[in-house]
Each structure stands twice: as structure tokens, then as C-alpha cells.
């Protein structure tokens, strides 16, 4: 499958969706192209994913300062307690509105990551990588 870019237009903005083979290996390049001011990235991932998935993503993001959290993808994780722990870590690591949160996994972690990114500094960048 060829890599494909789809543009989603909303009332307030447009954003790209990328999909295709080996797209995880190109994440760093795509971030640099679309979000050139990002310096720090927090990956919030499913601890049940194979380590090879994390390794591919981390290798692609080697030029960025990374914080990595792995959680169980269950409803207990989608809580204010967990969100506040992540937000505190982001603030302690001086994340700002030009930095980024990446969700790596399913819906629970995507919801949690989107929530965290929207609350931190009135909204930092968010990327969802569903598995």
C-alpha cells in the first residue's frame, strides 16, 4: 500500500491524516514537516503493545526530547488521577504549546492523551497513532 495523506477540514482548522505501510518509521519526518516547532514529545502508549512498535516510533523520533509512559488500556486508566500525573510530568519537563503528545494504542489511551494535551498549557499538539 502506498502512503496516503488525507486532509480533514473542520470549521476551525484543517489537519492531515497519514496512513500506509511503515508509516510508524516516518513519524519523525512527518512531525518535522507538519509541526516544525516541536522539540519535546510525550508518548502515551499501551503497555500490551509489542516492544518492536515502541522501538520503531522511538527510533523515528530520535531528534526529539522524549518522555514515554506505558499504561494498561482499560477504563481505570482513563481517569483524572492518571491525567493529572501526566500533566504534572509535562509541566515539570517544561512542555509548552509548541510541544506534542502522541497516543500509541487504542481508544482509551487516545481519549486520555487528547484530554491531557488539551488541558496542558491551554492546548499542546496532539497526534493519535491507533494500533
Regions found by a protein language model. Give the residues of each.
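Glycine/threonine-rich beta-strand-loop-alpha-helix active-site module
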Residues: 78-131
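ATP/NTP phosphate-donor binding region
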Residues: 1-100
